[in-house]
C-alpha cells in the first residue's frame, strides 16, 4: 500500500442492535464521487454486511428504521456510483442470508440472484451462511460467480473445496486490490452438523501471512472482509480491532457480525505504526457502505468513508427489470405468507432479563410440547438470538411468525438431572434467555440467589423435562447436552408456532404476554 493513514480516533460507533431510526437524508440519490470523477488513482469500495435476507424494505410500521433498506434501492445506489466512477468494487462481509421468509422458504435462491444482478465482486462467509448446512451453502454459491474468500475457514475436506478461496485479488480500473475473509469461531455458534468438516483457525494465525502473500503477488492494498465483529479492545484477537492492532499487512477492515452502525471509521494503529480504518454498515441494508481510497498518496485526507442511507428517495429510479425478478419470488410466496393466523393484542418485543416476546414464546412452547410429544415439560427455554423480529399489535400473518422464527430448528424435549438443571440455571444467571412461567429465578451479582421450578426447589437427584430447540442442545450451551434422553419434532419450529397461533385463534384468544416474576435481577 502506497503511504499510510495517520492514526486518530473516529467517533464512537453506535450500539450494535436497535440503533433507532436513521436520520432522514435529503440527498437525491445521485451519489457523486468525492473529487474528480473517474480519477485514475481512486478506487471505490461499496459494501454491505449482515443483510439477513432483507429483500424488501423494512415494514412501515416497524419500531426501528421503518421503510428503510430494500435491495432494489441498493441497486439504484450501486448503479449510480458505477456510472460516476471508473474503479468500483462491490463487497459483502457475511450473513447476506437468513432473517426473512425468503431464505427460510427458498434457501438462498433470491439472495444469490440479488448478488448477481447488483454485481457483487467479492464476499466472505458469515455464520448464517451455514444455516442450510454445507450442501445448502454449496447450492447457494453455485448460483452466481461472485468470488468467495475465507482465510481462516478451511473447506478442503468438504464439497466446497473449489468454491471458496483463501484470498483473491480483484482488479478495478487497472488497480489490484487484495481481499481476505475472516470468520467468527464456529464452535458454540453454528451447530456442528451444519459446519461438518470445516476446519477453523484463529484469525491471527492466517490473516497477516495471507495478506503479505497478496502484496507479494502484486496487490496494492489488502482489505479484510471480516465477520468477527467490532469491539474497541485492541488486545482481544477475536474482533476486528485486535486483528488490526496485531498485524501489519491489512490496510482496511470491512466488518460485520455485531450489526454495528459505524457512522465514522474507527482507526487502530497496527504493528507497523500505520492506522487501519475499520468500517461497518450495521445490518439489514439500512445503509450502503461507501469507501473511496486514493492509491497514489494514501492519507487521512485522501481516504473518505460514509454510510449512504437506503430509503424511499430512491424509489422513482428502481430498475424495472430487477423489480420484476424480485416480484417473481415475492408473488411465489405471497399467498401462503399473507395468510392471517391470529391477532396480537399488544406488540411483543424482546427484552432482558425478560421480554414479552420471549415470555410468550416459552409459555407457548410448554403447550406446544403437549401437542407434539404428549408431555407437559417442567419448563421451556429458547434463545433471544433466535427471536429475530417483534410481533406487532394487529393481525398476525404466517410471514410474521416466519420473521420471528426463521431458522430450521426443531422443537426438542430433553430430560435433565437436577444437577445438570442447576448448572443450566447458573448459566442463565450470566446470560439470561427466555424462560417459561413455571420458573422463579432470582439473580444477584451474576449468580443464582434462588431458583425454583413449579414452585419447588430443584432436587439434584430428580429428573426434569425441558422443552427447547435443537440448536441450543447441539451448540453445547447451558449444559443441555448433558441430557439423559432426547426427542425432536418432525416439523420445524416456525410451522409449529403457526399451528399454535391458529389454535389460540380457534379458542377465541389472541397473542399476549406480560412481564412477571419468572426472572428477577436484584
Predicted regions and their residues:
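Acidic, metal/ion-coordinating pockets
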Residues: 8-9, 34-311, 356-357, 361-367, ...
